[in-house]
């Protein structure tokens, strides 16, 4: 399975360079506590269904934590060749371009992203919130959704997700 191979490659490179660091990752139950020591959080292919069916709108996500505090993250939109990186004390970039912070605007001028399940059930008022916004987008990948937030294309992403889905954001 491609997810497992990508994760194995990332884990091998990280542990070779940082042998004392630990891993928290989606595949194979690698679950070192994020709150203890130096921990890398990995989602090898976020948006696996998109990867398999469309060959687009998927991302590789890696984050680094020290004693439970995120130091930086990387989100790689593979098919667009966009690498988002930074966070914590570092500015945020897309490839070589520093991204500008969000500028507050009325909700009716902004797009939001969600997963289909939250919209269908109106969980937490998602469908209602969508009616008050410019519109809702469903990308099928937390990494792609977060990259849209970082680029200023959407305001927020709402979903039921795991730590490896949001750690890099």
Question: Predicted segment positions?
Answer:
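Acidic active-site catalytic centers that drive phospho-/nucleotidyl reactions
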Residues: 1-3, 26-27, 43-46, 77, ...
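Residue-level signal for inorganic ion chemistry
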Residues: 3, 14, 48, 77, ...
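An extended, acidic
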Residues: 102-169
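A structural micro-motif at secondary-structure boundaries
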Residues: 94-98
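N-terminal subdomain of lithium-sensitive/metallo-dependent phosphomonoesterases centered on the IMPase/IPPase/PAP
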Residues: 1-45
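Solvent-exposed alpha-helices and their adjacent loops that cap or buttress functional pockets
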Residues: 32-34, 67, 85, 103-107, ...
């Amino acid at each position: 399975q491609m997810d497992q191979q990508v994760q194995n490659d990332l884990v091998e490179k990280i542990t070779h360079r940082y042998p004392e660091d630990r891993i928290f990752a989606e595949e194979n139950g690698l679950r070192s506590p994020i709150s203890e020591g130096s921990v890398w959080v990995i989602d090898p292919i976020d948006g696996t269904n998109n990867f398999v069916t469309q060959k687009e709108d998927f991302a590789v996500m890696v984050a680094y934590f020290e004693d439970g505090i995120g130091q930086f993250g990387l989100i790689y939109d593979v098919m667009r060749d966009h690498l988002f990186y930074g966070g914590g004390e570092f500015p945020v970039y897309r490839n070589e371009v520093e991204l500008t912070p969000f500028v507050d605007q009325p909700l009716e001028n902004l797009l939001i992203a969600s997963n289909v399940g939250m919209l269908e059930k109106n969980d937490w008022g998602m469908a209602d919130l969508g009616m008050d916004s410019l519109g809702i987008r469903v990308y099928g990948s937390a990494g792609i959704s977060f990259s849209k937030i970082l680029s200023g294309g959407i305001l927020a992403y709402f979903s039921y997700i795991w730590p490896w889905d949001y750690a890099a954001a």
